[in-house]
Amino acid sequence: YVEILKEELIPAMGCTEPIALAYAAAKAREVLGVLPDSVQLQVSGSIIKNVKSVIVPNTGHLKGMEAAVAAGIIAGSAEKELEVISEVSEEKKSAIRDYLQTVPITIEHTEQGHVFDIVVTERCGQDYARVRIADYHTNICRIEKNGTVLYEMPLLDETVQEDARADRSLLNMQDIWDFAETADLRDVADLLERQIRYNNAIAEEGLLGDYGANIGRVLLTTYGNDVSNRAKAKAAAGSDA
């Protein structure tokens, strides 16, 4: 169970699909070595569905795949992985907007047998860099520059992928209950304390700011501040933000 928690509770700056796009774009920019003058994005259907209308963090409320890619290129730090755009200055935010206005970013739907699939190709003149992420958000499986493969990791089929991860057959109500009752909290304290901090922070931001449909704030103002409603409101506010 501890290994499952470690695999699942990975910090990300915002909704993970657009952040994965930003990560791929930042990595391709790093490999290319210069600012690209055109970008091609090939993504699976699930990426399109989950990113199309989502606000990209630290961009001044820009939405969608193009914004995520531009943010990664202009302001991304690939070594931070899912916190790739956690630090974006006002100057960089302006540069992201300018980049979106001046550089063509094309999007193509592709299905290569993986539900989660992102390929970013960035070009400058005759040079190009290409990065592919597949199966999960930080899984860079191929890096290519000007026809030379710099890194490649064969993608596993779904059965092999599951075998490589912590055993999920434990995820039934009885075993989960037994773990909750008998676990040594020292094994999970750091993970859960971090999760509490992050979840509280995003919930408070959702209540204070103007995000999405503002469901969290509506619940509080309409139904009051009792414990039950406050729990619902904070969960909704975290989702809003």
Predicted regions and their residues:
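Alpha-helical support elements that line or immediately flank enzyme active sites
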Residues: P18-V34
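C-terminal catalytic/substrate-binding lobe primarily of soluble NAD(P)-dependent oxidoreductases
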Residues: I10, S86-T102, L192-Q195
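A structural-propensity feature for long, helix-poor, extended segments
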Residues: P36-K80, K93-I105
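Solvent-exposed alpha-helices and their adjacent loops that cap or buttress functional pockets
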Residues: M13, L32-L35, H61-L62, T110-H114, ...
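A short glycine/serine-rich beta->alpha loop
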Residues: K6-C15, K49-G60, D240-A241
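Short, Gly/Pro- and small/polar-rich lid/capping loops
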Residues: Y1-I19, Y23, R97-Q101
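Hydrophobic alpha-helical scaffolding
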Residues: P11-G14, I55, T59, L82-S86, ...
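Signature of multi-pass transmembrane helix bundles
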Residues: Y1, L100-A241
